[in-house]
């Protein structure tokens, strides 16, 4: 009956937006802020979940419980190991009147792409390795919004490790401070980052950063960031002093242990500064490939110069990413020297990671 069809259409009308984004860096945070501005522009109720790859199962279980919701996922690649969990969650959400938009810049398999594009209700998948996720979100969702354009510029500076914008570098440290603090206190990372996310969505960087004073508007956050910077510099110098090096296929490969409270991005930037290295050891040179090993057995890959493909190296350790930066997993370990020897051996048996971009 016409009345029933009209009622059904109203019931399936999108009324809210759920943002799922990466919690580890500025790109994920700014992507969520851009999505929030989109929700406001469309008059949709907004909720965000900031997460990481190890939490996909719970996140997609939550997605599957949504109804009449636009689900926008940003700065997260498809985790092949739980592809079926992702598929089940998305299919259930779509069956309940939801629509899926996925915006990302990581490497995707054909199977993962088909999983998203085969969904009902006109799914959108945009994957582009030339941009960070916030830039993609800006171009797809809010191309004429100046605040979103600014958020995308900040994210690009951090995600491509340019370090040309002072406020972008500061925001990176702020995200780390807040995230590590939440983890230490066993609090939800999303809840801890929400105040900053909300200010970014409202006013862009001017909501949290003062260009005149070169400081955060939140004085307590400023103090936390200052302390974090001093503390991590000490930790990274100590970690670099105990590095392991080996020449493999003509490339200098270096492995360092990441101390707690330091990210692989921090270590990658620190260890690529020749002045810093020379102050530790005059003979220490920037490595062609730097591997940062976390206490939990996760691997970060950063290159010191062209001629190395981090994503190809990470693939050898169940990971992936970009030519200039990537992530993988070694697993829990006890002996750093034994792990280094094993990693060096694995890299020596493969040449795919050696080559021009």
Predicted regions and their residues:
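Long, charge-rich alpha-helical interaction segments
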Residues: 187-227
């Amino acid at each position: 009956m016409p009345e029933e069809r009209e009622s059904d259409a109203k019931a399936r009308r999108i009324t809210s937006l759920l943002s799922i984004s990466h919690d580890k860096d500025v790109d994920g945070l700014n992507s969520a802020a851009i999505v929030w501005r989109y929700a406001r522009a469309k008059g949709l109720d907004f909720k965000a979940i900031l997460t990481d790859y190890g939490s996909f199962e719970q996140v997609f279980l939550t997605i599957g419980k949504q109804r009449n919701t636009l689900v926008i996922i940003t700065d997260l690649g498809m985790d092949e190991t739980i592809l079926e969990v992702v598929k089940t969650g998305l299919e259930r959400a779509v069956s309940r009147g939801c629509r899926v938009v996925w915006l990302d810049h990581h490497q995707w398999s054909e199977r993962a792409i088909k999983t998203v594009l085969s969904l009902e209700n006109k799914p959108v998948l945009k994957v582009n390795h030339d941009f960070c996720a916030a830039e993609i979100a800006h171009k797809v969702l809010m191309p004429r919004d100046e605040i979103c354009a600014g958020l995308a510029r900040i994210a690009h500076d951090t995600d491509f490790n340019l370090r040309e914008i002072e406020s972008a570098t500061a925001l990176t440290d702020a995200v780390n401070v807040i995230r590590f603090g939440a983890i230490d206190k066993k609090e939800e990372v999303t809840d801890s980052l929400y105040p900053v996310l909300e200010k970014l969505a409202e006013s862009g960087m001017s909501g949290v950063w003062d260009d005149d004073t070169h400081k955060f508007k939140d004085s307590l956050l400023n103090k936390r960031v200052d302390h974090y910077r001093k503390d991590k510099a000490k930790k990274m110098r100590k970690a670099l002093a105990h590095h392991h090096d080996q020449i493999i296929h003509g490339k200098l490969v270096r492995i360092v242990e990441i101390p707690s409270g330091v990210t692989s991005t921090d270590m990658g930037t620190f260890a690529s500064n020749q002045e810093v290295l020379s102050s530790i050891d005059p003979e220490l040179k920037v490595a062609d490939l730097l591997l940062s090993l976390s206490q939990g057995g996760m691997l970060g890959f950063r290159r010191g110069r062209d001629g190395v493909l981090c994503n190809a190296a990470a693939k050898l350790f169940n990971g992936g990413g970009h030519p200039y930066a990537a992530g993988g997993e070694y697993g829990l370990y006890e002996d750093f020297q034994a792990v280094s020897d094993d990693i060096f051996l694995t890299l020596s048996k493969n040449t795919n990671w050696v080559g021009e971009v």
